A protein has these predicted regions:
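Sec-dependent N-terminal signal peptides
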Residues: 4-13
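Predominantly soluble domains enriched in secretory-pathway, periplasmic, or organellar proteins
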Residues: 16-397
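Extracytoplasmic
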Residues: 36, 55-57, 93, 136-139, 391-413, 423-486, ...
Length: 486
């Protein structure tokens, strides 16, 4: 028994030389500028990115994965053409946030407030410091067809609508009304508000669990989160989580809630079985967040410190911090490209690439080691860590399949176009195979310095040629970055 315990301890220690380490791999990919002041950025799930430009530009700008502007949608509407017969003339909105329904077919955009019409219309607009039921003008949510990029319907909600979230079945769109201190429930088939739920001062962020039965709403003027049963519309509370909770994300298994606490400058992880909160400092005034599809990484924009922070959700540790343009306020994640889009309020959208890819193949090294005979490994010798690797590799039948020790690919050229970087070579091989099926002459390059295996789309002898190829690949929908071996 003692030998078995000693062997297990040795295995766990030895694996530290081989085991996966969280990689800090954020890099800036693109800056989009123009006539924009984005308050938020949202991904449709199908390669469209909607930026909401508030009353400063009165537009929604729509981009594709190649960073091309597809359309600038004006917030100018004729309300009488959308069922509001008493509203004559032209009106303007002020796009704030966006969510999607029906697998990305429709975008729903909130408008901070409305203007236009007669002098008596919209004469009591809400504001950031305004709150109270029945005092301020109601506003509207636009429904936009993502195929035509046209406004198809308009739904009246509360005062200063901000965040929106849809149920998984696309039956409801929920909207927080900042100044009227409540939540609107929109029936997407009836195209009208069917319920108004009183919440408290400054409701903001919303997340709906994957079952579609519960919605969580932050009350930014408090330290509480409302929990709403979407079958009965009754509410309960998670209390004392921290000051000014703003944005929410939820783990894939619905067991943890992530919240940005704007007043405390931290991000919290709430265990929903106990309501205990684990917190991490990310930067000044953390605002919006995005969660990777596997739930391992949280991306946080810090409005006061102009940074994008990457956090591992397992232990709530900061693993990367990268500078952004002024006032980052919105963020969205594209799990097809591993790109993070950041809305910077002062007038730009920044796109960052995270070269971390989730392992889809279990590391067989662990199982190979467990299969070995403990007595054959002399763990009594005090060897430096770098000397343990050859000893362990001698016990494994196929070490090259797990830890390649040579460069595979074209060693003559100096510039490589990288589509992905991996700790596990098998994952790199998987991506190379996928690229080859698409007609690319892809190959693997192993970097001895950082122990990453790169999936390369191409290699070039000059930087100018590499940039030209990179641009051509991006036009074809493949994001790459350049790696120089000089």
């Amino acid at each position: 028994m003692l030998k078995q315990l000693l062997y297990l301890c040795f295995i766990l220690n030895a694996l530290s030389a081989f085991s996966y380490k969280e990689d800090s791999t954020l890099s800036q990919l693109k800056i989009i500028e123009g006539k924009i002041n984005p308050k938020s950025i949202a991904h449709s799930g199908n390669g469209l990115f909607f930026a909401q430009n508030m009353m400063y530009k009165h537009t929604v700008t729509v981009y594709n994965r190649n960073f091309q502007l597809l359309k600038t949608i004006s917030d100018k509407v004729e309300l009488n053409k959308y069922g509001y017969s008493r509203r004559k003339g032209l009106y303007r909105g002020s796009p704030v946030e966006c969510t999607f329904t029906h697998n990305g077919r429709y975008a729903w955009v909130s408008n901070y407030n409305m203007s236009g019409g007669s002098e008596t219309e919209f004469s009591k607009p809400g504001c950031d410091n305004c709150h109270g039921t029945g005092i301020y003008d109601s506003s509207f949510v636009y429904k936009i067809n993502t195929s035509t990029l046209l406004i198809e319907a308009i739904v009246k909600v509360g005062a200063v609508p901000k965040y929106l979230a849809a149920t998984p079945d696309s039956k409801y769109v929920l909207v927080t009304n900042w100044s009227s201190s409540d939540l609107s429930v929109i029936d997407t088939e009836k195209l009208k508000e069917i319920k108004r739920i009183k919440l408290g001062t400054y409701p903001r962020g919303i997340i709906v669990d994957s079952t579609g039965t519960k919605a969580y709403v932050t009350i930014m003027g408090s330290s509480k989160i409302a929990v709403i049963d979407l079958r009965t519309f009754e509410k309960t509370w998670i209390k004392d989580i921290g000051r000014s909770p703003r944005h929410l994300c939820m783990s894939p298994k619905n067991d943890y809630l992530y919240v940005s606490l704007n007043g405390d400058g931290v991000v919290g992880k709430i265990d929903l079985s106990t309501n205990e909160v684990m917190k991490v400092k990310t930067g000044s005034l953390p605002r919006s967040m995005a969660l990777s599809r596997d739930g391992r990484h949280l991306y946080v924009v810090n409005y006061g410190s102009d940074t994008l922070t990457k956090v591992t959700t397992l232990d709530m540790k900061v693993v990367d911090n990268i500078k952004t343009n002024d006032k980052p306020i919105g963020v969205t994640y594209d799990d097809e490209t591993n790109n993070i889009w950041v809305a910077c309020y002062e007038g730009s959208i920044m796109v960052f690439h995270d070269s971390y890819y989730d392992s889809t193949v279990k590391d067989s090294l662990y199982y190979e080691l467990l299969a070995q005979n403990a007595q054959e490994i002399d763990f009594r010798k005090k060897l430096p860590l770098k000397d343990k690797r050859p000893m362990l590799e001698s016990e494994i039948e196929k070490p090259v399949d797990i830890l390649p020790d040579k460069i595979i690919g074209n060693k003559v050229n100096e510039y490589y176009l990288i589509a992905g970087s991996f700790k596990n070579k098998l994952n790199a091989e998987k991506l190379v195979k996928e690229l080859s099926i698409k007609g690319h002459n892809s190959f693997i390059y192993f970097n001895l310095d950082n122990q990453f295996t790169y999936a390369c789309v191409s290699s070039c002898s000059s930087k100018s040629m590499a940039i030209e190829k990179s641009n051509a690949l991006k036009e074809g929908g493949i994001s790459v970055w350049l790696y120089s071996v000089r």
